[in-house]
C-alpha cells in the first residue's frame, strides 16, 4: 500500500533580504519534496536555490498553478495518489492565502493527503498586525487592484 502523500505549504519571502528569517525546518521540508506546484516557476526555482544552495533544480518535476486549469488539479491529484511529497509555493508569502494554491490544498484534503503548512510571512497578517485593528474581528476582501 502506498503511504499518503504529504503536501508542504512552503512560504516564500516578501522581501529578498528576509531569507534569514525563515526557519531551518523549511529547508528540511524542501529536501523531502519530489515535485513542486508553484505560482511562478522561475521565481520559485530562484527562491529554492537561495534556500538550499546544493539543490539540483532540474531533478524535480515542476507544475505551474493556474486558478482555473483543471489539468493542473488533475496532475496534482495524480501525484497525490502516487504518495509523492509535494511542495506548493506562491509567488510571495504563504501559499493558499489569497492564492491559487488554495484549490490544490482543498483537493489534497479531499484525497486524504497530509497537509503541512509551514510558518512564513503573510502580507495579510502583517497588514493586520500593523493596522492596530482588532484581530478577532477582521475580514479580508481581497487585494487592492494594481
Task: Say what each PLM segment does.
Residues 73-115:
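Glycine/small-residue-rich loop that forms an oxyanion/phosphate-binding "nest" at active or ligand-binding sites
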Residues 6-10, 82-90, 138:
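Generic beta-sheet signal
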Residues 63-70, 143-145:
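Conserved helicase motor
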